[in-house]
């Protein structure tokens, strides 16, 4: 039996959910059109008579590849299953894949390529908050759509991102409330690595511990 860490499991299921949501999003958008694509020049468009182009942007190389490879595999599996079921209103989903290379500026660069040069309908991608924050200005400038496939620290909202995972208050605060109620905990030790998710999550947790639970 193969075992997955909680983050990897959430990432895989979140990626799968994101791809399935995209199917609904694109099909709804397509049904809203009052004209067939045959009536327009579809060269370079995200949706043509035969295909719907989407981008997949994860780290396939570098230190983050060990986590992100599973996400892109789940997304490609979901798209394969959608295509085998007839696609989106008879259109096959065409994948354009890019490698973020575990480098945050590269995520921004590849996001711009997918939106500006490849004209994808949406991008499934990023993993760390650093990669998402690097790519976010590009999606907002180009009015693109990013499906972010895993949980994150919160404190960020954008009309150009669908956050498919929980944010920190939906995870950590529930756990703290349980420990306080069931175990009577008063003193807490917050331990995490030095990057965006732990730093922000610990700030949220500390405020909840002190202001709501009366602990320290």
Regions of interest found by a model, annotated:
Residues 60, 161-216:
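An alpha-beta-alpha
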Residues 50-53, 90-93, 118-122, 141-145, ...:
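Loop/turn elements at helix/coil->beta-strand transitions in domains of secreted/extracellular proteins
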Residues 1-20:
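N-terminal secretory signal peptides and thylakoid transit peptides that target proteins
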Residues 42, 47-49, 73-95, 210-215:
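Signal peptide-proximal N-terminal region
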Residues 25-50:
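C-terminal segment of N-terminal export signals and the immediately downstream linker at the start
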Residues 35, 39-42, 66-73, 86-155:
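Beta-alpha junction/loop-to-helix N-cap segments that form part of ligand/metal-binding clefts
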Residues 50-68, 126, 187-191:
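Short beta-strand segments enriched in small/hydrophobic residues
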Residues 63-73, 196-201:
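Glycine- and acidic-residue-enriched helix-capping/strand-helix junction motifs
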């Amino acid at each position: 039996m193969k075992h997955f860490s909680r983050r990897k499991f959430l990432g895989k299921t979140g990626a799968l959910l994101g791809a399935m949501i995209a199917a609904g999003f694109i099909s709804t958008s397509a049904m809203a059109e009052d004209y067939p694509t045959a009536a327009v020049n579809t060269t370079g468009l995200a949706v043509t008579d035969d295909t719907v182009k989407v981008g997949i942007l994860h780290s396939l190389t570098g230190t983050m590849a060990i986590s992100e490879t599973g996400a892109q595999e789940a997304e490609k599996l979901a798209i394969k299953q959608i295509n085998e079921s007839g696609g989106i209103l008879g259109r096959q989903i065409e994948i354009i894949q890019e490698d973020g290379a575990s480098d945050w500026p590269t995520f921004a660069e590849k996001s711009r390529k997918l939106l500006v040069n490849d004209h994808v309908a949406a991008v499934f991608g990023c993993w760390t908050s650093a990669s998402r924050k690097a790519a976010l200005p590009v999606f907002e400038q180009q009015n693109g759509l990013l499906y972010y496939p895993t949980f994150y620290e919160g404190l960020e909202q954008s009309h150009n991102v669908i956050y498919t995972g929980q944010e920190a208050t939906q995870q950590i605060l529930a756990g703290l409330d349980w420990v306080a109620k069931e175990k009577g905990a008063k003193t807490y030790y917050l331990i995490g690595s030095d990057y965006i998710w732990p730093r922000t999550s610990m700030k949220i947790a500390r405020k909840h511990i002190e202001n709501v639970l009366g602990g320290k």
